[in-house]
């Protein structure tokens, strides 16, 4: 039997509007804990951009795509209004290295104790349909970025949110 370990490299995607409202999603495993889209690479050679696109789709139903190319099927894809162009996804060239909680280290190869998280921003219209993955998230809310930063339990997410005015795509 082959053991498949989690890859200690992940993305954090700050989903926001042009007016700097930020999408917060409430964790199903910890009600009251709010976060942005996060997730690890599925395979070592998966590009971070691919990880970000996949995680956004899985967790919110938002399809990030090259709109000049025909859409591929997605479990959450409905009307084109759930789609945003690839150009709206921006790699902020920021990364955070943090210790993996001991309770989760069994998911990683022996000796792995840290994860590197890469930060992206995704500009979306305020009225874009959000379809949460019910096993992962309970609820969502849009808040002004400063108010959103205060609501997050993760310091790295809060710090990324506060950087939004600097990195947002105009």
Segments predicted by a language model, with ranges:
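C-terminal alpha-helix
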Residues: 163-170
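Acidic, metal-coordinating catalytic segment for phosphate/diphosphate chemistry
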Residues: 1-14
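Conserved Nudix-box catalytic region and its N-terminal flanking loop in Nudix hydrolases
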Residues: 17-65, 69-82
